A protein has these predicted regions:
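A glycine-rich helix N-cap at a beta->alpha junction
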Residues: 52-81
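Residues at the starts of beta-strands that form the adenosine-phosphate
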Residues: 4, 34-37, 67
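Small/aliphatic-rich secondary-structure junction motif
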Residues: 29-47
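Short, glycine-rich nucleotide/cofactor-binding loops
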Residues: 5-18, 42-49
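C-terminal structural segments of small proteins and small subunits
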Residues: 81-103
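N-terminal glycine-rich FAD/FM-binding segment characteristic of electron-transfer flavoproteins
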Residues: 49-50, 60, 85-86, 90
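Structural beta-sheet core signal
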Residues: 7, 38-40, 70
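Histidine-anchored nucleotide/phosphate-binding helix
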Residues: 17-30
Length: 103
């Protein structure tokens, strides 16, 4: 049986976002689990788009070869969909996708 976790980062607090990204990066590099999925949701997308340290962490995670998922509805709401795509995130409607992961 494989071990899986979805790290869902949804805060507007930089420290909370940093911690979620840090865990996803280190956990993936050190193989804490078989599959670590990183999801950016809500206000975290807005702060990541505006913060070079956090966007750099997203790029570092992407360098592991794993995708970063960003919520399309939230990205559109905050006006950062293009920023998320430029960063390299897969911008998608996450509600049904996330539900499938947890089934």
């Amino acid at each position: 049986m494989s071990s899986q976790i979805a790290v869902i980062v949804s805060s507007s607090d930089k420290d909370v976002v940093w911690t979620g990204l840090f865990y996803a990066i280190k956990g993936t590099k050190k193989q804490f689990m078989d599959d670590i999925r990183l999801v950016l949701w809500g206000p975290s997308e807005k702060i990541i788009a505006a913060d070079s340290e956090l966007s750099g962490m997203v790029r570092e995670y992407l360098e592991t070869g794993k995708p970063v998922w960003a919520c399309r509805t939230c990205a559109d709401r905050y006006g950062v969909a293009r920023d998320m795509e430029t960063l390299g995130c897969t911008v998608a409607y996450m509600g049904s996708l996330t539900a499938e992961w947890f089934k």
